Each structure stands twice: as C-alpha cells, then as structure tokens.
Amino acid sequence: MAELKLGYKASAEQFAPRELVELAVAAEAHGMDSATVSDHFQPWRHQGGHAPFSLSWMTAVGERTNRLLLGTSVLTPTFRYNPAVIAQAFATMGCLYPNRVFLGVGTGEALNEIATGYEGAWPEFKERFARLRESVGLMRQLWSGDRVDFDGDYYRLKGASIYDVPDGGVPVYIAAGGPAVAKYAGRAGDGFICTSGKGEELYTEKLMPAVREGAAAADRSVDGIDKMIEIKISYDPDPELALNNTRFWAPLSLTAEQKHSIDDPIEMEKAADALPIEQIAKRWIVASDPDEAVEKVGQYVTWGLNHLVFHAPGHDQRRFLELFQSDLAPRLRRLG
C-alpha cells in the first residue's frame, strides 16, 4: 500500500499572494507533508476573490520551506500556456527544490482561457483531453535533456532543449473527474488527482478501477502511483461556523457544465450566490466532532486514495491548521 500523506490546499482564489505564501509556511510548521495550489487567471468569485500566479507562489514557498512537496492542483498546460515553457518552469523549480515539486495538470476551464485570448467556441472534452495528452508527451521529451523536434496536432518544437533539468524529470499528476482521464492517469501519470464529495460510486466503480486498468495496461504497479484526493472539509468545534464557512466557496456547488461554460467571475459569483447554504455544504465534510470528521475522511483511504490534501473554506486558515494538527492529524495518521 502506498504511503499515507497529508497535505494542505492553498486557496489561491481566496487569499492575496503574501498571505498565501505565509499559510503554506504555516502548513509545514503544523506537520503537513505537501501544499498544492490552483492555477487560475481569474477566480470563481469577483468580490473578495484573488488569483495570484501559481508558479511565483511555488517558488516563494520553496524558498521558505524545507520539506513540503509542492505542486499545482491543477494547471492547464494547453491554452494560455505553451507546454514547452511550462516544462522549462517546472524543470527549474525541480532543480531548485529537488524531489519536492510536481506538476498537476487538467483539461481546463473557459474561465481562465477565454479572458486571455482563446477565440471561438470553448472546445469539447475530446479536444481538451487530446491537447493534454500531447502536452504531457511534449514536456516529457524536453525533460529528457535531449534536443527535441516535435510535430503534433496542436504543438510544435524545432531543435528545442531545456538545459537545466532535474534527474528523472518532473513528476506529472493527472486530474480526472471521469474514467477516461483516470485510465490515462493510471497509464501515464506519476500521480492521480481527484476531488471529494461526489458520491461513493464515482470513486469505487469508476475512478479507481480506471486508474488500476490504466496501470495494468502499461504493465505498471498501481502502488507506484501517488493517488491524491483534494478533500473539502469544514471542521470547527463550533457547528454554525463550520457550516457558514462554506459560503465563500459556493461556486464549487455549481454543475460541471456551468463551471466549464462560464467565462466571467461576476457571472460565476452571481450563479453561485443564488444557491442555498444547504446545497453549498453538500460538497463539504462539515463536522464539529473529530471522530466524525475522520470517519468521513477515512472512507477515501478505504477506497484506495493515499494522499489526502485538505481544503478548508474559512477565512481563518491558521485556526484550521491548529485544529487540524491537534484534533485530526493524529487520528488520520493512524489510518495509514
């Protein structure tokens, strides 16, 4: 069984750059094994929203910490970015912080790409997935250190080389919400990323079997794949506070279709704020009792996930980190 790891999700949509760095430093001080960050050009909420650049944040945190594993959860290397430039950026960070950096990738959302110049109708999943696969292949060729000519359907390189590359390249974690990408993660990913709160059947009957199927098809051991889940948890001894803390993150409760099609934070905020608190809270583990919280988290370990990254919705993140260290972490470590 893969090693159990506990991580912290740095909420880039909620906090300004300096505070976001300090929270990751605090996460290491409170015993977390990893810290991940989303890569949004625009946040999901216009009022009070933030969107610091993920790679600047990773470098700043890397300089301030000693052992945290740092990565994106997730970045889309296929539209507003050239994947070759992303490969260069992560190779540099991999050299600066050896064995502490991974690249988490996904297929993308219109919210981040339309504003930065993508023209035409937002591509359907088939094209976005094809772009992702091609970009991962391109980046891995560059991380070999060789001189690369690449002529793909979407990207091209001519005599390209990255001169500073960490030994072994950069681990790529692939985010999936369905079995097709999960199978690809099992076949080609160093890690797999999913999110909590979507019903047991998704994990036990679709995602995890697909990861195993992909690994088997590539003659790989699934134990060698870091299986990460971003767990949405609002834990506080005050039940009312635990519930109301979820309000800021109402956009998470919009449907996937809504989130993928809306390209304006103002419109996203308007749609999200129309939701009742009860619907918003359904995406979260809302708990005031530590044993209840750990029982709900523990099911994901039972289902085969080993790297638990905790996303807390409240504005007082230091309170969450203190409560996590005292109330939840000792119980969670025993699950491993």
Curated annotation (Swiss-Prot):
Entry keyword annotation includes Oxidoreductase: yes
GO cellular component: cytosol; peptidoglycan-based cell wall; plasma membrane
Presence of keyword Transport: no
pH effect summary: Optimum pH is 6.5-7.
GO molecular function, one term: oxidoreductase activity, acting on CH-OH group of donors
Catalytic residues identified in the record: H40 (proton donor), E109 (proton acceptor)
Gene3D superfamilies, alphabetized: Luciferase-like domain (3.20.20.30)
GO biological process: carbohydrate metabolic process; cell redox homeostasis
Top-level taxon of origin: Bacteria
Catalytic activity: oxidized coenzyme F420-(gamma-L-Glu)(n) + D-glucose 6-phosphate + H(+) = 6-phospho-D-glucono-1,5-lactone + reduced coenzyme F420-(gamma-L-Glu)(n)
Positions of substrate binding: T195, K198, K259, R283
Keywords assigned: Carbohydrate metabolism, Oxidoreductase
Positions that bind coenzyme F420-(gamma-Glu)n: D39, T76, T107, G108, N112, G177, G178, A180, V181
Disruption phenotype: Cells lacking this gene display a strong resistance to PA-824 and CGI-17341 (a nitroimidazo-oxazole).
InterPro entries according to UniProt: F420-dep_G6P_DH, F420-G6PD/mer, F420_G6P_DH-rel, Luciferase-like_dom, Luciferase-like_sf
Activity regulation (record text): Inhibited by citrate.
EC numbers on record: 1.1.98.2
Pfam family membership, one: Bac_luciferase
Segments crossing the lipid bilayer: none
Subunit structure of this chain's protein: Homodimer.
Main function: Catalyzes the coenzyme F420-dependent oxidation of glucose 6-phosphate to 6-phosphogluconolactone. Appears to have a role in resistance to oxidative stress, via its consumption of G6P that serves as a source of reducing power to combat oxidative stress in mycobacteria. More precisely, is likely involved in a F420-dependent anti-oxidant mechanism that protects M.tuberculosis against oxidative stress and bactericidal agents.
Family per similarity comment: Belongs to the F420-dependent glucose-6-phosphate dehydrogenase family.
PANTHER family tied to this protein: 5,10-METHYLENETETRAHYDROMETHANOPTERIN REDUCTASE, PTHR43244
Protein name stated in the entry: F420-dependent glucose-6-phosphate dehydrogenase
Designated gene of the protein: fgd1
